Amino acid sequence: MKSIVNDKILLTQQKLEEIEKELEHLINVERVNVIQEIKDARSQGDLSENAEYDVAREKQGIIESRIRELETIISKAKIIKADLGSSRVSIGSKVSLENVESGEIQTFQIVSSIDADPFKSKISNFSPIAQALLGQHQGDEVEVDVNEKYSVRILEVINE
């Protein structure tokens, strides 16, 4: 499964809520502020050499572009629902695995590329490790190829 399926964008419920919150802030705070900045800059007179006006207009363009981007994401969002109660790894699964050679244990959640945040242990479904794990089950030993091949054992799959 990819992050975009039939023109839908796969997101966790949490990520969708974050995007909606950002959109609300952009519309209700940032957009209002930049409109005021433009009005203030216009009141200074000649716009041909008004740096504040140019900066405010550029900022407005960035804000409006981000608003359109977020609205598109929201309109195409499909919430990821892991296979509840299943031991099969899917997008949305939290997975604990052990490196067979080193014994090192890692735990992370497989999410869409939009949701991915390695600092929060959320990896993209496009990453090599996720690609190796998707469709596998708790207890399976899987070969992962990231620069070099190594084997991992799936210790636990949590689908909530």
From Swiss-Prot:
Pfam families: GreA_GreB, GreA_GreB_N. Residues 3-84 form a coiled coil. GO terms for molecular function: DNA binding; RNA polymerase binding. PROSITE patterns: GREAB_1, GREAB_2. Keywords: Coiled coil, DNA-binding, Transcription, Transcription regulation. One of its GO terms (biological process) is regulation of DNA-templated transcription elongation. Necessary for efficient RNA polymerase transcription elongation past template-encoded arresting sites. The arresting sites in DNA have the property of trapping a certain fraction of elongating RNA polymerases that pass through, resulting in locked ternary complexes. Cleavage of the nascent transcript by cleavage factors such as GreA or GreB allows the resumption of elongation from the new 3'terminus. GreA releases sequences of 2 to 3 nucleotides. NCBIfam families: greA, PRK00226.1-4. Belongs to the GreA/GreB family. This is Transcription elongation factor GreA. It comes from Mesomycoplasma hyopneumoniae (strain 7448). The gene is greA.
